[in-house]
Protein backbone atom coordinates (compact mmCIF):
# COMPACT_ATOMS: atom_id res chain seq x y z
CA UNK A 1 0.00 0.00 0.00
CA UNK A 2 1.26 3.50 -0.76
CA UNK A 3 2.27 5.56 2.26
CA UNK A 4 -0.34 8.28 1.64
CA UNK A 5 -3.02 5.59 1.53
CA UNK A 6 -1.84 4.22 4.87
CA UNK A 7 -1.96 7.68 6.44
CA UNK A 8 -5.38 8.44 4.96
CA UNK A 9 -6.90 5.08 5.93
CA UNK A 10 -5.56 4.97 9.49
CA UNK A 11 -8.37 5.23 12.01
CA UNK A 12 -9.30 3.69 15.33
CA UNK A 13 -11.14 0.42 14.64
CA UNK A 14 -13.45 -0.56 17.49
CA UNK A 15 -15.02 -3.79 16.22
CA UNK A 16 -13.12 -6.87 15.10
CA UNK A 17 -13.91 -10.19 13.45
CA UNK A 18 -12.71 -13.47 14.96
CA UNK A 19 -10.30 -14.02 12.06
CA UNK A 20 -6.79 -14.63 13.42
CA UNK A 21 -3.86 -12.34 12.69
CA UNK A 22 -0.89 -14.16 11.17
CA UNK A 23 2.38 -14.45 13.05
CA UNK A 24 4.07 -12.83 10.04
CA UNK A 25 1.85 -9.75 10.32
CA UNK A 26 2.48 -9.46 14.06
CA UNK A 27 6.24 -9.72 13.52
CA UNK A 28 6.19 -7.07 10.74
CA UNK A 29 4.14 -4.76 12.96
CA UNK A 30 6.54 -5.17 15.87
CA UNK A 31 9.67 -4.89 13.70
CA UNK A 32 8.38 -1.57 12.38
CA UNK A 33 7.64 -0.37 15.92
CA UNK A 34 11.34 -0.81 16.66
CA UNK A 35 12.23 1.49 13.73
CA UNK A 36 10.77 4.61 15.33
CA UNK A 37 12.87 7.61 16.37
CA UNK A 38 14.80 7.29 19.61
CA UNK A 39 16.54 10.28 21.21
CA UNK A 40 20.25 9.49 21.40
CA UNK A 41 19.34 5.99 20.19
CA UNK A 42 18.35 5.34 23.81
CA UNK A 43 15.87 2.71 22.63
CA UNK A 44 13.80 3.11 25.78
CA UNK A 45 10.76 1.18 24.66
CA UNK A 46 9.55 -2.35 25.28
CA UNK A 47 6.45 -4.16 24.08
CA UNK A 48 4.33 -6.95 25.53
CA UNK A 49 2.42 -8.87 22.83
CA UNK A 50 -0.57 -10.80 24.16
CA UNK A 51 -2.78 -13.37 22.45
CA UNK A 52 -5.19 -16.06 23.58
CA UNK A 53 -5.35 -16.67 27.32
CA UNK A 54 -2.79 -13.96 28.12
CA UNK A 55 -4.89 -11.39 26.26
CA UNK A 56 -8.01 -12.50 28.13
CA UNK A 57 -6.10 -12.26 31.39
CA UNK A 58 -5.18 -8.66 30.59
CA UNK A 59 -8.81 -7.77 29.87
CA UNK A 60 -9.89 -9.41 33.13
CA UNK A 61 -7.42 -7.21 35.04
CA UNK A 62 -8.40 -3.83 33.65
CA UNK A 63 -11.61 -1.90 34.27
CA UNK A 64 -14.37 -2.84 31.81
CA UNK A 65 -14.60 0.65 30.29
CA UNK A 66 -10.90 0.56 29.45
CA UNK A 67 -10.98 -1.94 26.62
CA UNK A 68 -14.59 -2.97 26.03
CA UNK A 69 -14.50 -2.40 22.29
CA UNK A 70 -11.04 -3.93 21.93
CA UNK A 71 -11.74 -7.21 23.71
CA UNK A 72 -12.57 -9.11 20.52
CA UNK A 73 -9.29 -8.24 18.77
CA UNK A 74 -7.02 -11.30 18.64
CA UNK A 75 -3.79 -9.37 19.36
CA UNK A 76 -3.00 -6.86 22.07
CA UNK A 77 0.27 -4.90 22.30
CA UNK A 78 1.18 -3.04 25.49
CA UNK A 79 3.94 -0.47 24.82
CA UNK A 80 6.19 0.58 27.69
CA UNK A 81 8.32 3.70 28.10
CA UNK A 82 11.62 3.18 29.93
CA UNK A 83 12.75 6.52 31.35
CA UNK A 84 15.98 5.12 32.82
CA UNK A 85 17.24 4.20 29.34
CA UNK A 86 17.15 7.91 28.43
CA UNK A 87 18.59 9.17 31.71
CA UNK A 88 21.44 6.63 31.48
CA UNK A 89 22.14 7.33 27.81
CA UNK A 90 22.29 11.11 28.22
CA UNK A 91 24.65 10.82 31.19
CA UNK A 92 27.24 9.23 28.88
CA UNK A 93 30.22 11.32 27.72
CA UNK A 94 29.11 11.75 24.10
CA UNK A 95 25.88 13.43 25.24
CA UNK A 96 27.47 16.03 27.50
CA UNK A 97 25.40 15.73 30.67
CA UNK A 98 27.16 14.48 33.76
CA UNK A 99 24.11 13.37 35.68
CA UNK A 100 20.79 11.61 35.15
CA UNK A 101 18.72 14.69 35.96
CA UNK A 102 15.19 14.86 34.63
CA UNK A 103 15.39 18.66 34.59
CA UNK A 104 17.28 18.34 31.28
CA UNK A 105 14.08 17.03 29.72
CA UNK A 106 11.39 19.74 29.46
CA UNK A 107 9.55 17.22 27.26
CA UNK A 108 9.98 13.59 28.38
CA UNK A 109 11.22 11.92 25.20
CA UNK A 110 10.64 8.44 26.69
CA UNK A 111 6.92 9.12 26.18
CA UNK A 112 7.36 10.90 22.85
CA UNK A 113 9.43 8.11 21.32
CA UNK A 114 7.14 5.38 22.64
CA UNK A 115 4.16 7.27 21.21
CA UNK A 116 5.91 7.37 17.82
CA UNK A 117 6.40 3.60 18.04
CA UNK A 118 2.66 3.26 18.69
CA UNK A 119 1.91 5.28 15.55
CA UNK A 120 4.13 2.91 13.57
CA UNK A 121 2.14 -0.02 15.03
CA UNK A 122 -1.13 1.62 13.96
CA UNK A 123 0.17 2.45 10.47
CA UNK A 124 1.71 -0.97 9.90
CA UNK A 125 -1.57 -2.61 10.92
CA UNK A 126 -3.28 -0.62 8.13
CA UNK A 127 -0.55 -1.64 5.68
CA UNK A 128 -1.18 -5.28 6.66
CA UNK A 129 -4.90 -4.90 5.90
CA UNK A 130 -5.78 -4.89 9.60
CA UNK A 131 -7.47 -2.53 11.98
CA UNK A 132 -6.24 -1.29 15.34
CA UNK A 133 -7.29 0.88 18.24
CA UNK A 134 -5.15 2.56 20.89
CA UNK A 135 -6.63 2.88 24.37
CA UNK A 136 -5.42 3.89 27.79
CA UNK A 137 -4.90 1.76 30.87
CA UNK A 138 -6.38 3.20 34.04
CA UNK A 139 -3.82 4.23 36.66
CA UNK A 140 -5.59 1.96 39.14
CA UNK A 141 -4.93 -1.07 36.88
CA UNK A 142 -1.22 -0.59 36.17
CA UNK A 143 0.08 -2.48 39.22
CA UNK A 144 -2.15 -5.49 38.50
CA UNK A 145 -0.95 -5.62 34.88
CA UNK A 146 2.66 -5.20 36.01
CA UNK A 147 2.38 -8.06 38.52
CA UNK A 148 0.43 -10.43 36.26
CA UNK A 149 2.92 -10.21 33.40
CA UNK A 150 6.21 -9.74 35.29
CA UNK A 151 6.76 -6.22 33.96
CA UNK A 152 9.94 -4.59 35.37
CA UNK A 153 9.32 -1.73 37.78
CA UNK A 154 11.02 0.86 35.53
CA UNK A 155 8.78 0.06 32.53
CA UNK A 156 5.74 2.34 32.37
CA UNK A 157 2.79 1.28 30.19
CA UNK A 158 1.50 4.12 28.04
CA UNK A 159 -1.67 2.33 26.95
CA UNK A 160 -2.42 -0.64 24.72
CA UNK A 161 -3.13 -1.34 21.06
CA UNK A 162 -5.70 -3.94 20.00
CA UNK A 163 -5.08 -5.37 16.52
CA UNK A 164 -7.27 -7.51 14.29
CA UNK A 165 -9.41 -7.65 11.18
CA UNK A 166 -11.91 -4.81 11.27
CA UNK A 167 -15.56 -5.89 11.42
CA UNK A 168 -16.93 -2.72 9.86
CA UNK A 169 -16.05 -0.22 7.19
CA UNK A 170 -15.77 3.50 7.83
CA UNK A 171 -15.97 5.26 11.17
CA UNK A 172 -17.39 3.23 14.06
CA UNK A 173 -20.74 4.35 15.51
CA UNK A 174 -20.15 6.54 18.54
CA UNK A 175 -16.59 7.40 17.47
CA UNK A 176 -15.45 10.99 17.89
CA UNK A 177 -15.23 11.74 14.13
CA UNK A 178 -19.02 11.31 14.07
CA UNK A 179 -19.45 14.16 16.55
CA UNK A 180 -16.71 16.56 15.51
CA UNK A 181 -14.81 17.25 12.31
CA UNK A 182 -11.11 17.49 11.68
CA UNK A 183 -9.80 20.99 12.37
CA UNK A 184 -8.98 22.98 9.21
CA UNK A 185 -5.38 22.87 8.02
CA UNK A 186 -4.94 26.66 8.26
CA UNK A 187 -6.21 26.69 11.83
CA UNK A 188 -3.59 24.16 12.92
CA UNK A 189 -0.54 24.73 10.68
CA UNK A 190 1.28 28.09 10.86
CA UNK A 191 4.09 28.98 8.46
CA UNK A 192 6.65 31.52 9.66
CA UNK A 193 4.66 32.80 12.64
CA UNK A 194 1.30 32.49 14.33
Language model features by range: what are they?
Residues 1-88, 191-194:
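N-terminal amphipathic, basic helical "cap/leader" segment at the start of enzyme domains
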Residues 42-45, 127-132, 158:
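Short secondary-structure junction motifs
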Amino acid sequence: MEFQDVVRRRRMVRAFTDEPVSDESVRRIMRNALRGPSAGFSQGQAFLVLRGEEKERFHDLVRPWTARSARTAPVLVVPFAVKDAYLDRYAQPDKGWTDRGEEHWPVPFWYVDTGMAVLLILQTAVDEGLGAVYFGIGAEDVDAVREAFGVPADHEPIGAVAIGHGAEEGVSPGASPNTRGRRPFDEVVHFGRW
